[in-house]
């Protein structure tokens, strides 16, 4: 499978990794989550595990760009959760890039190990 077969509806679910949004935000923005952190992490990791290893990095990229667009730090993008109105977007983007790593979901990717290479 190449990256060209990893897009929403083909290789990726539509609107991938939505279960990761509040997990990422809770881990980066310093507020107490509504659910136990282990529950949110497990849900996020299950959603990431459901994506084939060849498409996991692309799934993370799509999720990050949609959930935490770079323009959000300049006031654009979708509204943030009310509990984290001043949380920097780049902090959330950086944390979300680590979701495949051993300290998080520890899932293999197209690169052969539990990591992604992002531009």
From Swiss-Prot:
Keywords: Disulfide bond, Protease inhibitor, Secreted, Serine protease inhibitor. Optimum pH range is 7.0-9.0. Optimum temperature is 25 degrees Celsius. Pfam families: Tryp_alpha_amyl. One of its GO terms (molecular function) is serine-type endopeptidase inhibitor activity. GO terms for cellular component: extracellular region. Its main location: secreted. It comes from the Eukaryota. Gene3D superfamilies: Plant lipid-transfer and hydrophobic proteins. SUPFAM superfamilies: Bifunctional inhibitor/lipid-transfer protein/seed storage 2S albumin. It is found in: Secreted. Disulfide bonds join 6-55, 20-44, 29-87, 45-105, 57-116. Belongs to the protease inhibitor I6 (cereal trypsin/alpha-amylase inhibitor) family. Inhibits bovine, insect and wheat chymotrypsins. Inhibits bovine chymotrypsin with Ki of 0.6 nM. Does not inhibit human or wheat alpha-amylases, bovine pancreatic trypsin, or trypsin-like activity isolated from wheat. This is Chymotrypsin inhibitor WCI.
């Amino acid at each position: 499978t190449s990256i060209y077969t990893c897009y929403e509806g083909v290789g990726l679910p539509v609107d991938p990794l939505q279960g990761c949004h509040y997990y990422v935000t809770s881990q980066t923005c310093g507020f107490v989550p509504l659910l136990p952190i282990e529950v949110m992490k497990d849900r996020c990791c299950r959603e990431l595990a459901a994506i084939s290893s060849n498409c996991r990095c692309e799934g993370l990229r799509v999720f990050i760009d949609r959930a935490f667009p770079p323009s959000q730090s300049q006031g654009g993008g979708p509204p943030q959760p009310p509990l984290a109105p001043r949380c920097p977007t780049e902090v959330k983007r950086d944390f979300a890039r680590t979701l495949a790593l051993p300290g998080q979901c520890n899932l293999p990717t197209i690169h052969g190990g539990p990591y992604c290479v992002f531009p």
